[in-house]
Regions:
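Glycan-recognition and catalytic cores of secretory/periplasmic carbohydrate-active enzymes
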Residues: 1-131
């Protein structure tokens, strides 16, 4: 219970402050680099673990509306993260099409967990995580 309260309090802070900072960014203002990575992930490092943790918190009873953040993260993971032609997560640093175990750890679990909250699209995310 104490740990869940701790997690929920921090996720609530992100969920409640993200819309404000999103508006600031849209209006051309500068925002903190950490919040920028929440709003505009640029790597699995910015999105994977947070996405999976937020989904887990939701499935464990968090009352905070995390879906806008989760959807933003999963959109990055599914549509913007670099992949090989077969769909394997990869990166272009330090070398072109480098495959890292770390990317599997940060990419596959959030996709698999998203199947739990994806409603009628659950099979799509389960299949993606398994391939």
């Amino acid at each position: 219970k104490a740990y869940m309260d701790y997690v929920d309090k921090r996720f609530r802070l992100l969920a409640e402050s993200a819309p404000y900072f999103k508006k600031v960014k849209e209006l051309g203002g500068r925002i903190d680099g950490n919040m920028s990575r929440v709003l505009s992930p640029g790597a699995l490092d910015d999105s994977g673990a947070m996405c999976a943790a937020m989904i887990k918190a939701m499935t464990k009873g968090s009352k905070t509306d995390l879906m806008p953040l989760i959807d933003n993260y999963i959109n990055y993971i599914m549509t913007k993260e670099h992949r090989l032609s077969d769909g394997t997560f990869a990166r272009n640093r330090p070398f072109f099409n480098s495959v890292w175990l770390d990317d599997m750890f940060m990419g596959i679990p959030p996709v698999a967990w998203y199947a739990k909250v994806a409603g009628s699209n659950a099979q799509k995310y389960s299949d993606e995580a398994a391939k």
